[in-house]
Regions:
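N-terminal pre-catalytic "stem/leader" segment of glycosyltransferase-like enzymes
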Residues: 1-83
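Extended catalytic core of nucleotide-activated donor transferases of GT-like folds
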Residues: 51-133, 549
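Conserved catalytic-core segment of nucleotide-activated headgroup transferases in glycan assembly
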Residues: 184-280, 448
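Carbohydrate-associated surface elements
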Residues: 146, 182
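Short alpha-helical donor nucleotide-sugar binding micro-motif in glycosyltransferases
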Residues: 279-282, 287-292
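Short hydrophobic beta-strand element within catalytic cores of glycosyltransferases
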Residues: 319-322, 332, 339-340
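Acidic donor-binding loop of glycosyltransferase active sites
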Residues: 290-305, 318
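C-terminal amphipathic helix plus adjacent low-complexity
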Residues: 358-512, 519-522
């Protein structure tokens, strides 16, 4: 079974940097998994600087490996024909295909991998795969079915443009296999002594229910916590005799975001004690994993593509409550490992302005993520029901935790994942050797930008449409108005005020639904025609913050 040369830059494979992101954690975990589970005895590495090769060798030495490393740099790219495949820790293999062209398109194969696919840079690199000299023996690993669908949408949109612009008749695409990220499941096994000590650290006795969120604490770019807070409060009201603790183990980018979390939790889940741990510290992560009874991640963000943390929770034997969103659809079996909660998003055609603001750099990527996630809702009632089921049944928690642990070990441990990588690399070599002739390069157009609600329309459980029946979540119009005003005042809601409906428009919506149930198409008749699309989209924002609910 073949292995591959590894394109190595320390930043891509380390969690020690100043701005820890999911791709860093995934890269570090992959490298460790590769070094521990590869079948090769000959290591190749491509570097930009020789010092990086020394860092790679030191990493291997820490794992007890002493095999020599063969180093390739920009002055010796042709040597990559010896390992036959080069693995890059990102999707942008188009740039490297141009580098390869000097040595012949069939000199070696390229293999990349997706992380987020919603940023301008990621979409540019994916769209560029069509115009760059990428070949049928190249591959971009998609970490989930959801991200593969988005990659295919981007590629199709770019191909359509080239057909219209240049009369494109020939299309050569890389392989797009779905191979999930892996974890080291043994890292998440804790004994009874560790669990007792961890719960003592957060002042949780054996009868306290500990719910854990693990990851970046970023309402605009990771998982907006308002739905989780609201659902926990509902569950707390259903279990008045139980003490509930929410552990948020992560890190805030700044004081503004930290204060936004604090004010939202104070308003939305006053019955729940919130403990915040700095997730950049390994000891805090151990405390979080070892103390938790239930894990929750209600991701509602376009930048999420796989979501490794629920699998880590499963490896720790913790039942999970997650949104029915992106990669979670693949990893978490609803009703088996935990619960997947329905999500709703506006349909295609309602986000072109958001895409354009991002494309023209009026909005930063963070603001683009925040604006789009403002219109993506997670079903609070279903979340509360899931919490209540788990809170009420230690047996269910144990059953789901054990099922998740078994799945994590059998499906998502690197011992099971690395052989899938090496099988792919074998396939790439076989295709290249059979088909490796010279091919004409395609033209190089500027990449596409898509309406986010078109590009990601497959992420949610359902799409809001004109026939969707809506009503007020509270029977009282006055209460609904007061709640809306309270939520609008929250920093984590108000930050997106530029794309939210006016107070008059909100009042018109609430008045229309006072003591009645209407379709979304009928509701927007209460505002001027030129505002129909804007207000239609805003109905999903009102669903998101719990003012409206869907009537089924």
């Amino acid at each position: 079974m073949a292995s591959a040369a590894i394109y190595y830059h320390p930043e891509a494979y380390s969690i020690g940097g100043p701005k820890l992101m999911g791709r860093n954690a995934a890269g570090e975990s992959f490298l460790r998994g590769f070094l521990l589970h590869t079948n090769t005895s000959e290591y190749w590495v491509q570097v930009e600087q020789q010092v990086h090769a020394q860092t790679f060798a030191a990493t291997r030495k820490q794992l007890g490996q002493a095999h020599p490393v063969k180093v390739v740099d920009k002055n010796s790219l042709g040597a990559l024909s010896q390992p036959g495949v080069i693995y890059y820790p990102g999707p942008g293999i188009g740039e490297h295909a141009w580098h390869r062209a000097a040595f012949g398109h069939g000199a070696y194969s390229l293999c990349g991998i997706t992380h987020t696919t919603s940023s301008a840079g990621a979409m540019d690199s994916i769209a560029a795969l069509i115009s760059a000299p990428v070949q049928a023996w190249d591959a971009v690993i998609c970490t989930s079915t959801a991200v593969k669908t988005h990659v295919e949408k981007l590629l199709q949109a770019q191909a359509n443009y080239l057909v219209d612009r240049l009369g494109l008749q020939k299309l050569v695409l890389p392989l797009l296999p779905v191979i999930p990220l892996g974890i080291h499941t043994q890292d998440f096994v804790f004994n009874a002594t560790q669990k007792t000590a961890a719960r003592k650290t957060i002042d949780a006795d054996k009868d306290t229910l500990v719910v854990l969120f693990m990851g970046r604490l970023s309402f605009h770019a990771k998982a907006h916590p308002l739905a989780m807070y609201q659902a926990l409060e509902k569950a707390a009201q259903l279990n008045p005799s139980k003490k509930i603790v929410l552990v948020e183990c992560g890190w805030f980018a700044n004081d503004f975001i930290e204060k936004a979390y604090q004010s939202a939790a104070k308003l939305s889940c006053p019955s729940v004690r919130v403990v915040t741990l700095d997730g950049r510290e390994a000891q805090n992560r151990t405390v979080a994993w070892a103390s938790a009874d239930v894990f929750c991640s209600l991701s509602d963000n376009l930048q999420e593509t796989f979501g490794i943390v629920p699998i880590e929770a499963m490896a720790a034997g913790i039942p999970v409550v997650v949104s029915d969103w992106d990669g979670y659809k693949d990893t978490v079996r609803d009703g088996v490992d935990g619960f997947r909660i329905p999500t709703t998003m506006p349909g295609p055609g309602l986000g072109g302005d958001l895409a354009l603001r991002h494309a023209l750099e009026i909005d930063t990527y963070d603001m683009y993520c925040g604006h789009t996630c403002s219109f993506i809702s997670v079903d609070v009632e279903a979340t509360a029901i899931a919490f209540n089921q788990l809170f009420s049944s230690p047996e269910l928690r144990k059953k789901m935790g054990e099922a998740g642990m078994e799945r994590a070990r059998e499906v998502y441990d690197w011992a099971a994942i690395i052989p899938q990588y090496e099988k792919l690399w074998d396939e790439q070599n076989e295709i290249r050797k059979a088909q490796g002739g010279s091919l004409k390069p395609l033209a190089n157009p500027w990449p596409a930008r898509m309406d986010p609600f078109t590009a990601f329309s497959h992420y949610p459980t359902k799409l809001l449409n004109a026939d969707t029946k809506l009503t007020l979540n509270d029977d009282s119009l006055e209460t609904s108005i007061n709640l809306l005003n309270d939520y609008r005042a929250l920093a984590m809601v108000n930050f997106a005020k530029l794309v939210l409906p006016s107070e008059d428009e909100c009042q018109a919506i609430l008045n229309a639904l006072n003591r009645s149930t209407l379709s979304a198409g009928d509701i927007i008749q209460s505002v001027p025609a030129e505002r129909h699309a804007f207000v239609f989209r805003a109905l999903n924002w009102l669903l998101k913050i719990g003012i409206l609910k869907v009537v089924t």
